C-alpha cells in the first residue's frame, strides 16, 4: 500500500463557494481525508492578468485553457472592483471543512503573497501570516496548526517568519521528503512537508493530455521514492474537473494508493527527520520562482 498526502489549496472565492462543497462530497463518498489550505482574505486573483506579458505565464494560461478551467469570475476578481473577503463570505463552508478534515492557512491575500512576499521584510511576513491565522481561527473556532505558502513562494525568511506561530508543520516548498529546516547552526524550525508531485496545470499540454492525466499521475505516485504529496485545487478539481478527480480516487484505490492528510505523514518523533533548507528555484510548468527543498549541507 502506498500512502500519499493529499493537499487541497483553496485560492479564491469561487473555489471556496463552489469547489470545496463538491470536494467534501466527493471525498466523503470515497472515505478519503485530506488537508485543506484556505485563503481567507480578499480575492484579488484577477490581478495576475498583468503577468500575461510574461511568455512563460502566457503559455501556461494557453496550455491549460485557463478561461475554461477557472472561469472569468476568478480571472477578473479584484481587477475592476475590490476583491471580496473569502472568509467572511464562506465561513460556514470553511467551518464544515474543519469539522472533517485537517484545515490550515494558505494565505490572507493569495495574490499579494504570491506577488510581494519575495521582498517583504520579516515583520511584514509575520503580520500577514498573523492576519490570516487570526481570521481562520475566528472562523473554525480552534487553533490553526498548519500552513502552506501560496504559490510555494517561500524561502528562509518565510520559514523564520512562521516560527512564532507554533505550527505543527508547514508545506511551503517542492521537494522529495519531509525535513526540518535549518534556521542557524544548532537550531531547526517547524517540520516541512514538501509537495513532491506535479499539479494538473503544470503538465497538461503537449506532453500529457487530459484524458491520460490520471494514468500518468498514478504512475508518478507509485514511482515516487520519497514521501509522495499531491496537490489539487478547489478551483480545478472541485469544479470543472471534479469528475476527473473522482475517477482518480477510484483508480488510485485500485492501484493500492491510500490518500491521507499531510499531518499523518509526520513521524512520532519529528527530531528524526533530516535537516534541510528552502531555497528559491524553478520547476517545469510553473512561471516564476518558488521554494525548493535543498540539503542543509549544500552551499
Curated annotation (Swiss-Prot):
Keyword line: Antibiotic resistance, Hydrolase, Lipid A biosynthesis, Lipid biosynthesis, Lipid metabolism, Lipopolysaccharide biosynthesis
Pathway(s) where this gene product acts: Glycolipid biosynthesis; 4-amino-4-deoxy-alpha-L-arabinose undecaprenyl phosphate biosynthesis; 4-amino-4-deoxy-alpha-L-arabinose undecaprenyl phosphate from UDP-4-deoxy-4-formamido-beta-L-arabinose and undecaprenyl phosphate: step 2/2; Bacterial outer membrane biogenesis; lipopolysaccharide biosynthesis
GO-annotated biological processes: 4-amino-4-deoxy-alpha-L-arabinopyranosyl undecaprenyl phosphate biosynthetic process; lipid A biosynthetic process; lipopolysaccharide biosynthetic process; response to antibiotic
NodB homology domain location: 2-260
Gene Ontology MF: a single term: hydrolase activity, acting on carbon-nitrogen (but not peptide) bonds, in linear amides
Superkingdom as given in the UniProt entry: Bacteria
Enzyme Commission number: 3.5.1.n3
Database matches in PROSITE patterns: NODB
Class of this enzyme: hydrolase
GO cellular component terms, semicolon-separated: membrane
Reaction catalysed by this enzyme: 4-deoxy-4-formamido-alpha-L-arabinopyranosyl di-trans,octa-cis-undecaprenyl phosphate + H2O = 4-amino-4-deoxy-alpha-L-arabinopyranosyl di-trans,octa-cis-undecaprenyl phosphate + formate
PANTHER family: 4-DEOXY-4-FORMAMIDO-L-ARABINOSE-PHOSPHOUNDECAPRENOL DEFORMYLASE ARND-RELATED, GLYCOSYL TRANSFERASE-RELATED
Function noted in UniProt: Catalyzes the deformylation of 4-deoxy-4-formamido-L-arabinose-phosphoundecaprenol to 4-amino-4-deoxy-L-arabinose-phosphoundecaprenol. The modified arabinose is attached to lipid A and is required for resistance to polymyxin and cationic antimicrobial peptides.
Protein family (similarity comment): Belongs to the polysaccharide deacetylase family. ArnD deformylase subfamily.
Protein name in UniProt: Probable 4-deoxy-4-formamido-L-arabinose-phosphoundecaprenol deformylase ArnD
The organism of origin for this protein: Salmonella agona (strain SL483)
